[in-house]
């Protein structure tokens, strides 16, 4: 199983640097200690290789978990690349949501594509999110890597895995719509974003045609 193999290699080869662990420890001491901690990883932006799970689906599952286990006091750590998701979860769980000061996006462009952000900062943010998720007492995750890696970092972490309910998207990757376009996030400046999406797809089609043309003329 991939997860078992991942846990084996993480335990054997991955050693997190002390200054990263200190940042994790400081955040955890401030927001997640002395109460039941729930980790949530939810992808937005350009996520497209599987059907995205909506915030409403997460929230319903979280309430069910709390009710089933009679949990009254808890804190929720949210790891996400989409700014709008923070607003949704804070509205549903006021005063209980924490999140690391990571790079996030307000649209369909994933933060790791941001050219004006230092690449080390991008990587550090994701690593800290993974470590904080792994230190929670229960995890809700979708079909994306960060939540999965949290399970590799902590083999005893219990979770609800929406990936088991999420269909893999078929067809050419460059033509798929990302989660930002598929999930209802309120006003997105829809016309401008639709034009941006069409332009993005058109550019990718041109790149594919160019590659085919160059291959045929080698």
Regions found by a protein language model. Name each.
Residues 41-45, 69-119:
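Catalytic donor nucleotide-activated moiety binding site of glycosyltransferases and closely related
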Residues 1-73, 207:
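Secretory-pathway luminal glycosyltransferase catalytic domains
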Residues 97-108, 160-177:
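A generic structural motif
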Residues 38, 73-76, 97, 136-139, ...:
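Hydrophobic beta-strand segments of well-ordered beta-sheets in folded domains
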């Amino acid at each position: 199983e991939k997860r078992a193999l991942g846990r084996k290699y993480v335990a054997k080869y991955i050693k997190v640097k002390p200054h990263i662990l200190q940042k994790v420890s400081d955040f955890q001491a401030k927001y997640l200690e002395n109460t039941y901690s729930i980790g949530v990883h939810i992808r937005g932006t350009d996520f497209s290789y599987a059907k995205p799970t909506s915030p409403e689906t997460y929230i319903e599952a979280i309430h069910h978990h709390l009710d089933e286990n009679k949990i009254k006091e808890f804190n929720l750590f949210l790891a996400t690349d989409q700014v709008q998701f923070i607003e949704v979860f804070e509205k549903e769980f006021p005063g209980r949501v924490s999140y690391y000061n990571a790079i996030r996006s307000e649209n369909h462009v994933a933060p790791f594509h941001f050219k004006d952000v230092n690449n080390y900062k991008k990587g550090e943010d994701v690593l800290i999110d993974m470590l904080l998720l792994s230190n929670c007492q229960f995890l809700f995750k979708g079909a994306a890597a960060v939540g999965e890696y949290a399970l590799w970092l902590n083999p005893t972490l219990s979770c609800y895995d929406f990936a088991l309910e999420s269909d893999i998207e078929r067809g050419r990757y460059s033509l798929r719509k990302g989660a930002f376009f598929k999930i209802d996030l309120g006003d997105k400046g829809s016309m401008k974003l639709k034009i941006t999406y069409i332009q993005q797809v058109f550019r990718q089609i041109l790149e594919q045609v160019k590659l085919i043309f160059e291959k045929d003329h080698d």
